Amino acid sequence: MTMGTGESIQQIREKLKGRPETAELERWRQDSRAGVRKLLETYDRKQKTQAEERERLERFQDLERAFWARGMDQVAGCDEAGRGPLAGPLVTAAVILPHSIWLPGLNDSKKVTAARREILYGEILEQAVSVTVSILGPREIDRLNIYQAAKTAMTLCLTHLKVRPQAAVTDAMPLEIPGMEVEDLVHGDSRSAAVAAASIIAKVTRDHLMEDLDRQYPQYGFAKHKGYGTARHIQAIMDCGPTPWHRRSYEPLKSMSLKEEGVSENQLLQLK
């Protein structure tokens, strides 16, 4: 041992995985062993990264904080996944986050890897005040058009949260909901933590549903393209015809003059 710490490198490594006392850190910094110095360098880098991420997440809630300052303590974010695909449901989510969050990597779902989205999904459900999810099937999308379907789904999500928000932020969707101040924000999922959280919940939920559909209809490749109009997907439609989950109002299906409607599979889930 060096400098009389009385601790092995392995013991120090284990303690650094938790929350070491300031006195312990100061003692270890006096240790001249190369292995201890390396452990502390790694620890310091991790602490710096976490501090920067906490600052980023705090800034990410600036929009919500403006509402809180006006006495609106419960602010929901709302976003959807699945406007553009030829097949599959439109999934919308609304999320109320607490005033203090620790959701490392939270961002617009399109900027987050699939693996990180899965982790964030669980962390959001654990930390959120309230979460709702709407699932609208192809028949409703065809009947309403995708814009009105998204508007309807967002309204349903925001009005069925178990904790009613005084304010809400949407990703570029203007809404009028009695008793709720709604701000529609372009690129809201990159500018509001609550909207970003909703985008993660919606995206992960929809991806799981498309993976389920892939098992039912393996020839279409739903697990890979998630219903978007890739060359393989369009070729599968031409070769095999549409499934009940294809949107009849989207090309090339619209030009096929199909008689049967798409499936009507609608759900409203209060996850928390």
Q: Locations of the language-model features?
A:
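RNase H-like, Mg2+-dependent phosphodiesterase core
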Residues: 1-76, 83-272
